[in-house]
Swiss-Prot record:
GO terms for cellular component: cytoplasm. InterPro entries: Aldolase_TIM, Elp3/MiaA/NifB-like_rSAM, LIAS_N, Lipoyl_synth, rSAM. GO terms for molecular function: 4 iron, 4 sulfur cluster binding; lipoate synthase activity; metal ion binding. This is Lipoyl synthase.
Length: 309
């Protein structure tokens, strides 16, 4: 495969196409506003002018319209081609291009132009880099803080598989305000839904970051509907607390296309609320739990209490 060439859909996941007639119907509570407004066009224009990507667009997030209308976005750095091919995700797979050394500056310029005060920076997984891209994260944070004033930065990182020591060291060059790494699902479903990832290694990443930088809040996210049970979710939540995770997001998995993993169930708003209450009882400082919640959805509001801003 050529550098920069993208694989999506069936080419990426290698899953058999599923008959849509057999798919579960979306319930009435799965509703997201269409991303059509002048503000969406304005923000998209800024991003394209600076050659930036948002996970909102690349992962077909159901909240894109609402978040763009509010003037917020989650930036995806290090390109838009991922070295992994998770069958729940709509980000393209392939051989990524070299890092763009001008990206940190462009990112800071975009944040200034968009007048943001809280930003989330995430990335594709870059198994091809010696530190998984951690130094690039730190460079982006440093550039934001040099060019803007008072902006809080949350990073949503991959698992840095095989590069954790180097990643933790390089992140220390310029630390975020919040460190986020998603477990995504329960350990029983990892082989199918997160090929290449390891449940306990992801837990350990959260724990090691907390041990290394104890003053930085940690966060993780789960998506429901891949075939997990309620008790399995509660067990993962307990594991996260044991490993020092402070904040949690829980949302509904929505299938990007018929070439991705099918939705096994739609969790009711009442059950999402039960998970939220259970999480607070376990000791999470903040739990956002609902059908359309994503790890970066209203991240500024969730972090407000923790960061005392």
């Amino acid at each position: 495969m050529d550098v920069g060439q993208k694989k999506r859909g069936a080419d990426k996941t290698a899953l058999a196409t599923t008959d849509e007639q057999g798919a579960l119907s979306k319930p009435t509570w799965i509703r997201a506003k269409a991303p059509i407004s002048p503000e969406v066009g304005r923000l998209t224009g800024i991003l394209r002018d600076l050659h930036l990507h948002t996970v909102c667009e690349e992962a077909s997030c159901p909240n894109l319209g609402e978040c763009f209308k509010r003037g917020t976005a989650t930036f995806m750095i290090m390109g838009d081609v991922c070295t992994r091919r998770c069958p729940f995700c709509d980000v393209a797979h392939g051989r990524p291009a070299a890092l763009d050394t001008e990206e940190p500056g462009h990112l800071a310029d975009a944040i200034g132009a968009m007048k943001l005060k809280y930003v989330v920076i995430t990335s594709v997984t870059r198994d091809d880099l010696e530190d998984g891209g951690a130094a690039h994260f730190a460079q982006c944070i440093e550039s934001i803080r040099k060019k803007t004033e008072g902006v809080k930065v949350e990073i949503l990182v991959p698992d840095f598989r095989g590069h954790v020591d180097a990643a933790l060291k390089n992140l220390g060059n310029c630390l975020p305000d919040v460190f986020n790494h998603n477990l995504e699902t329960v350990p029983r479903l990892y082989a199918e839904s997160r090929p290449g990832a390891r449940y306990h290694e992801s837990l350990r990443l959260l724990q090691r970051f907390k041990e290394t930088y104890p003053g930085i809040p940690t966060k993780s996210g789960l998506m429901l509907g891949l075939g997990e049970t309620d008790e399995e979710i509660l067990e993962v939540m307990r594991d996260l607390r044991v490993h020092g995770c402070d904040m949690l997001t829980i949302g509904q998995y929505l299938r990007p296309s018929r070439h991705h993993l099918p939705v096994q169930r739609y969790v009711t708003p009442e059950q999402f609320e039960a998970f939220r209450v259970a999480g607070l009882k376990m000791g999470f400082s903040q739990v956002a739990s609902g059908p359309l919640v994503r790890s970066s959805y209203h991240a500024d509001l969730q972090a407000k209490e923790v960061l005392h801003t």
